[in-house]
Swiss-Prot record:
The modification N-acetylmethionine is found at residue 1. It is found in: Cytoplasm; Nucleus. The lineage of its organism: Eukaryota, Metazoa, Chordata, Craniata, Vertebrata. Homodimer. Interacts (when binding to resveratrol) with PARP1; interaction stimulates the poly-ADP-ribosyltransferase activity of PARP1. Keywords: Acetylation, Aminoacyl-tRNA synthetase, ATP-binding, Cytoplasm, Ligase, Nucleotide-binding, Nucleus, Phosphoprotein, Protein biosynthesis, RNA-binding, tRNA-binding. Residues 339-363 are annotated as: Disordered. It catalyses: tRNA(Tyr) + L-tyrosine + ATP = L-tyrosyl-tRNA(Tyr) + AMP + diphosphate + H(+). Resveratrol strongly inhibits the tyrosine--tRNA ligase activity. Its EC number is 6.1.1.1. GO terms for biological process: tyrosyl-tRNA aminoacylation. A motif ('KMSKS' region) lies at residues 222-226. The modification N6-acetyllysine is found at residues 197, 206, 474, 482, 490. The gene is YARS1. It comes from Pongo abelii. This is Tyrosine--tRNA ligase, cytoplasmic. Residues 364-468 form the tRNA-binding domain.
Amino acid sequence: MGDAPSPEEKLHLITRNLQEVLGEEKLKEILKERELKIYWGTATTGKPHVAYFVPMSKIADFLKAGCEVTILFADLHAYLDNMKAPWELLELRVSYYENVIKAMLESIGVPLEKLTFIKGTDYQLSKEYTLDVYRLSSVVTQHDSKKAGAEVVKQVEHPLLSGLLYPGLQALDEEYLKVDAQFGGVDQRKIFTFAEKYLPALGYSKRVHLMNPMVPGLTGSKMSSSEEESKIDLLDRKEDVKKKLKKAFCEPGNVENNGVLSFIKHVLFPLKSEFVILRDERWGGNKTYTAYMDLEKDFAAEVVHPGDLKNSVDVALNKLLDPIREKFNTPALKKLASAAYPDPSKQKPMAKGPAKNSEPEEVIPSRLDIRVGKIITVEKHPDADSLYVEKIDVGEAEPRTVVSGLVQFVPKEELQDRLVVVLCNLKPQKMRGVESQGMLLCASIEGINRQVEPLDPPAGSAPGERVFVKGYEKGQPDEELKPKKKVFEKLQADFKISEECIAQWKQTNFMTKLGSISCKSLKGGNIS
């Protein structure tokens, strides 16, 4: 490649490792005439994690292709999305994001002087922008706005108006930043197509949209800021990185939903153009790969062991994180991190004495500790013909004993080694002399011919994976549900099986990171 890349070489750099491009022909035309103007925006909500290296590596590609790149710190969006960033923390979050993202870019050798950094509220509160928000609201339907934000904005039963404004503001950003293209994750696709539909209604042109794939988290599926064990924080200590990688989902030979392999593909290879598997001489010694697919093929063939893969990623990842940790090891940035993300347990000191006038506890699904389980053994209860006693692996050191009344409905052979859904924080109780340490959740149709089916996690799920209601991923479950408060009973009243056999709470899906919880056939059934 010469000093100035050709339009074809620029196109390759811009689009490599992307999952989808909308408007590729327009992109080609622009590259024939001039440099591409592009922006990447990030809402300043939770702490950035290592998956942010995916857009960082693409920003490096854009700069190599000669693009003019703007990074938007979308502080107003962070507030509009169900107040994921409280108003009083917006400035602090923006400062944290700016420092940590600049540190990430420096760690991969990206020259900061070639980038433009801008804060959303620097222009989104202007008279012109505000007028365009009103103009847009006069042509956009509620349906289209909600649909556009479905993969990005927190989904709740009664959405706030702020969340419905979010997609429109993101569309307007393309015009007000004067760019040709917007770059983001494939989870932004509906917002991108929303922008393509509605910007012309205001007399503005369609933009090109570039989408990178979502990197699976360490437990499978999308890496999430709200799922602690699925992500590695940029400031995690080396021992924490090793611990999380050790627990990562990485089955021998399995290349699907493999967050470890995906991180190598989308971050380490684009940055270094090679990856070294570090291993003992007894197992063949170190091996250098210069093409990702060669590594994937060897892993699929079990030539590369998961332990060696994880150890090698551990070394490579810590080389990226070391400069970031070093930068944040100053009193000023330590103080910033603490102020931008205050410890919730220290925000409100406990009042002395009983809190008689305190507000009632919120009854929400995140209070339930529901997990994927695998039935290890199943036997008839020694003293009850209608009960099974199961030993179920729910991701703990020892399997739990669970008693369930399924003898009349599910043959023993169908339960053995089956993946199930278990409620784990009910108070243990004895059932005919055997203590049950959880509840195996099932769909049921009541009546004379009662039918019962255990709920099914998505294929590929692992014992211990958290089950949550979409939109309620955050929050820690109660350590133990207090029987007198009837939290489970109140929530259970809105549990239902949909017409598509999906388990739901108030018409919102129960999920793991791999997809929705379902049952075999009991449409419209209850869940207990």
